[in-house]
Curated annotation (Swiss-Prot):
Family: Belongs to the protein kinase superfamily. CMGC Ser/Thr protein kinase family. MAP kinase subfamily.
Extent of Basic and acidic residues compositional bias: 426-439
Record keywords, A-Z: ATP-binding, Kinase, Nucleotide-binding, Phosphoprotein, Serine/threonine-protein kinase, Transferase
Name of the encoding gene: MPK10
Entry's free-text remark on domains: The TXY motif contains the threonine and tyrosine residues whose phosphorylation activates the MAP kinases.
EC top class, as a word: transferase
Molecular function via GO: ATP binding; MAP kinase activity; protein serine kinase activity; protein serine/threonine kinase activity
Post-translational modification: Dually phosphorylated on Thr-187 and Tyr-189, which activates the enzyme.
GO cellular component: cytoplasm; nucleus
Species assigned in the record: Oryza sativa subsp. japonica (Rice)
Identification of the protein by name: Mitogen-activated protein kinase 10
Amino acid sequence: MQQDQRKKSSTEADFFTEYGDASRYKIQEVIGKGSYGVVCSAIDVHTGEKVAIKKIHDIFEHISDAARILREIKLLRLLRHPDIVEIKHIMLPPSRRDFKDIYVVFELMESDLHQVIKANDDLTKEHYQFFLYQLLRALKYIHTANVYHRDLKPKNILANSNCKLKICDFGLARVAFNDTPTTIFWTDYVATRWYRAPELCGSFFSKYTPAIDIWSIGCIFAEVLTGKPLFPGKNVVHQLDLMTDLLGTPSMDTISRVRNDKARRYLSSMRKKEPILFSQKFPSADPLALDLLQKLLAFDPKDRPTAEEALAHPYFKGLAKVEREPSCQPITKMEFEFERRRVTKEDIRELIFREILEYHPQLLKDYINGTERTTFLYPSAVDQFRKQFAHLEENGGNGPVIPMDRKHTSLPRSTIVHSTPIPAKEQPRIGPSRDKPSDEPYSNPREFDRFSGNAPRTSQAPQRVPTARPGRVVGPVLPYENGATKDSYDARRLAMNSGYPPQQQIPQAYGYYQIPGKSACSELSQAERYTLHQQAYTCANSATVTDVALDMRAPPFHLSGGPKSDSSERLAAETNLYTRSLNGLAATAAGVAASAHRKVGVVPYGMSRMY
């Protein structure tokens, strides 16, 4: 039991690699494999729903494969319909620039129509009718969006035990625009031959229509009725022979409209064949079903009905109402601009990343506003909160909150000790007057420079650490600006010590400096004490220091508001504070001197409040 559990955990780790949403899904079993990757069944621990997760690996190895994946996820986002498989989620990759795999979360379907046909020999006429109804209803929605599926076959139609069907696999689909060159539109057509319309087998026409999908639906419906493929051709010529064996040779009018000279000559030279009665080919089928099937399998595409016209056929009386079957708005050219120009792998990667963000609304908003991050390997605490809020937004405010994972980049900031002295830097004279608290809180942390009368300067801070690379642990060092820190990802600001309420005594730092010949600080003479006092006062008020300075005027916390006063009042108040705390400052100077003697600089971090 434990061995199975460990094996399952190992499988999950191998399946998800570094993707952060992995904890949301509990892998059950592998339900499919192919050249694209692997499909696993899983449970969404947030909703309890069963899903199928399709891992597509190395998607950018071949640009044609990447374009096919982009096309499919884009179309499935745009074509939302009960009879079309739904993408529920796409996991956010660990890096925007370097990801190679994607994880697409679908609703879980138990089987496909190919398996249903093979395993069930007891399907009823009601099954046949309901199956065809769902397929035509989905096709109506697809075609009203000006989309041709181009690869309809039983394996691309998912099925559940409750007879629910859903069309999937839009990798070969295309959006038809009036100005799309036909030669480009069909150059990569490699759909399964058995379900391919005759005009595609022989390149009969230069302009193709949605009738190619109608033909495929007819072939699928005939296979449902008989349990075996209708036209299992071994090659294109054999395929055309099988078609004409059932339907008869096409009329001279149809042949005359064939644009391809070779195909036209072949059809003209074909011996005359009479069509076979469908009632003879399908003896146990409903006559209305056969009447509709014969229309779906018309050799000439202009004789085939549209999906909407087929739904209005008497075969669906009492089941379908054309006016209530949904239609889709035509898809705009902008969505598929990449199909009309030469694109690189980097272009496709960016477009796929943009599609992934459609399932992460908050990050999509940042992306559109130009404030997105380029890597998501090590999220900070703020990123974790954003993830929780995005989860609640995506789930309509329902469902449990994602637990906060403790990441090394969100650990508390520790004291940074430099092994070499920090170069002398100019110390800012910041901090508002401490005579009385202000009744008006200010929102801009830069305003205290105006209150104090000082020009903006850069406060002393630890030297900036290079940006962390994936896999390298580097503590967080925020950029400093005028005593405030700013998160590069968030518009909110962190203000350091922008205000300080009146108090009796300022924080003190204690140290001991031993003068040669003296055992301790307590043995200093009055003159030596006075000298140290003067040094401390000079250090506290000077603009520069020679080695290391601890600005004890900066408290370890601050309030959101600060008093407003002129510089003379502020100076008087600070002078009084320094006079009362002269002994403490002397000890501070002694500590500074000791630190300088040891050549070790200690940079204290005060707590700050986010707003």
